A protein has these predicted regions:
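Active-site hotspot residues in diverse enzymes, especially metal/ion-binding acidic/histidine motifs
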Residues: 1-172
């Protein structure tokens, strides 16, 4: 199975020496802004006059803003052609029905959760799935995408302890 999303994340991390989505967006000259204009829209990205923009709703927690930034970075890195036509708006992250959203979620999980951190932390047999997520400062939903990525790449020691909730960030 193709590893292009994981490889694209690792190439970006090697080049810029960071996994921080905001630092990566800055290094790529992407304009990032927060807005209070939307009640349900988490974020979106678009291309205008050869400049990429990421807009993130300011009602989100810092953790959610980081996930949305990584997700939108995924769109910029993986879906440039689609961005030339129309903005990508994300009212619900973790959407499994739309391939572009699915890919952006995998990108965000691979960016924010390094394989080594997951492998090291998951060796602690005292941690259940939710404790693992808490220890790695992530959501169970994003961890599900990371585990799926690991399994897809042949890491059979992992299993999916919960189903992916495509409406996770859509809940208030």
């Amino acid at each position: 199975m193709s590893n292009y999303i994981f490889q694209s994340v690792e190439k970006l991390v090697r080049r810029y020496q960071t996994r921080d989505p905001f630092k990566l967006l800055d290094a790529l000259n992407v304009v990032v802004q927060e807005t209070d204009q939307y009640q349900h829209l988490k974020g979106y990205c678009f291309l205008c006059c050869k400049t990429y923009y990421v807009i993130i709703s300011d009602f989100l927690s810092e953790e959610e803003k980081r996930i949305v930034a990584a997700h939108e970075l995924g769109h910029i890195m993986l879906h440039k052609r689609q961005l030339q036509v129309a903005p990508m708006k994300d009212s619900v992250l973790y959407n499994m029905r739309d391939n572009t959203e699915y890919e952006a979620n995998l990108f965000a999980a691979d960016l924010l959760l390094p394989d080594e951190d997951v492998a090291h932390t998951s060796k602690n047999e005292e941690l259940n799935y939710f404790s693992l997520c808490s220890t790695l400062y992530t959501t169970p939903e994003l961890m599900s995408f990371k585990l799926y990525s690991l399994i897809r790449r042949g890491n059979s020691q992992y299993n999916m302890p919960m189903a992916i909730d495509s409406k996770f960030l859509g809940k208030h």
